[in-house]
């Protein structure tokens, strides 16, 4: 874990460089945090072990609660063999209206053989006028498993705010043993026709993606097709605007709508089913979601 290098930040600077580096390993029948390093206002708020199998639930927090123009926020997280970590945030993230400078978030996840990482941050709000760049790079070893999502809300819905100024650039890449499985890129500017087009956002305010990679023994088409049909039945019962597809052996779900709570509930339900099918685990939602 050497991607992150220390950046010095003076108290008079108008922006932050915040970086968090975490490592998880399996020891004495549970997952523990074996490595932690942070710079700037980002850290682990709490760790919990609510599951009998010793899964570590970690809550990471960025005290400013959002990313302003000029900020650089970086996460680097690694799970060692047999470790199982669930990572979430205490509340919605925010891309604030810019001061003319671009803001950046970089997420690097490295999942070793026979380990499981669940990356489940709460939604991110894109304020009108934000200039946001987000990059997620996930590297899986051959027998690693992953569940994760990204939820974006355009504007502040409580203020009926639309995204008419600024820009958003998101790049997501998922690799296994240096083979690129998924490359997902999104770019738009405030006021773009794409935001209102039926071929784009269709005037909806919430878009989200869910990604899941099963354990190696469940990657055959027999299991994948069976599990995706069960998930489709779940989505139909919930009556939510979610579509499902398979990209090789990666399960992908997409949400497009106006209610971020419905999105969260749908993705949490999919995650709960996959935990049962793939890992024989209960749903065990992070406790912070209930507060």
Swiss-Prot record:
Compartment(s) where it occurs, according to its Swiss-Prot or TrEMBL record: Cytoplasm
GO molecular function, one term: nickel cation binding
GO cellular component: cytoplasm
Keyword Nucleotidyltransferase: no
Assigned keywords, A-Z: Chaperone, Cytoplasm, Nickel insertion
Pfam families referenced in this protein's UniProt entry, alphabetically: UreD
Role, per record: Required for maturation of urease via the functional incorporation of the urease nickel metallocenter.
Family: Belongs to the UreD family.
Subunit and partners: UreD, UreF and UreG form a complex that acts as a GTP-hydrolysis-dependent molecular chaperone, activating the urease apoprotein by helping to assemble the nickel containing metallocenter of UreC. The UreE protein probably delivers the nickel.
The protein's name: Urease accessory protein UreD
Organism: Acinetobacter baumannii (strain ACICU)
Gene label: ureD
């Amino acid at each position: 874990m050497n991607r992150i290098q220390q950046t010095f930040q003076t108290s008079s600077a108008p922006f932050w460089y915040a970086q968090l580096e975490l490592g998880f390993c399996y020891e004495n029948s549970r997952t523990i945090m074996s490595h932690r390093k942070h710079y700037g206002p980002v850290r682990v708020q709490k760790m919990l072990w609510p599951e009998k199998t010793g899964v570590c639930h970690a809550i990471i927090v960025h005290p400013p609660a959002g990313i302003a123009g000029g900020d650089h926020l970086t996460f680097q997280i690694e799970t060692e063999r047999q470790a199982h970590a669930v990572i979430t945030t205490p509340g919605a993230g925010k891309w604030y209206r810019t001061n003319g400078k671009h803001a950046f978030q970089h997420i690097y996840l490295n999942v070793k053989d026979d380990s499981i990482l669940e990356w489940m941050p709460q939604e991110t709000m894109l304020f009108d006028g934000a200039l946001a760049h987000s990059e997620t790079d996930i590297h899986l070893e051959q027998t690693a498993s992953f569940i994760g999502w990204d939820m974006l809300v355009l504007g502040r819905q409580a203020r009926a705010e639309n995204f008419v100024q600024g820009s958003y650039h998101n790049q997501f890449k998922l690799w296994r043993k240096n083979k690129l499985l998924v490359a997902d890129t999104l770019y738009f500017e405030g006021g773009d026709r794409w935001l209102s087009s039926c071929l784009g956002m269709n005037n909806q305010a919430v878009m989200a993606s869910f990604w899941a990679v099963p354990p190696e023994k469940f990657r055959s088409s027999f299991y994948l097709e069976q599990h995706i049909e069960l998930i489709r039945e779940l989505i139909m019962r919930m009556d939510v605007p979610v579509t499902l597809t398979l990209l090789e052996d990666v399960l992908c779900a997409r949400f497009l709508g106006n209610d971020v709570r419905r999105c969260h509930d749908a993705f949490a339900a999919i995650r709960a089913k996959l935990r049962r099918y793939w890992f024989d685990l209960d749903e065990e939602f992070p406790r912070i979601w209930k507060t």
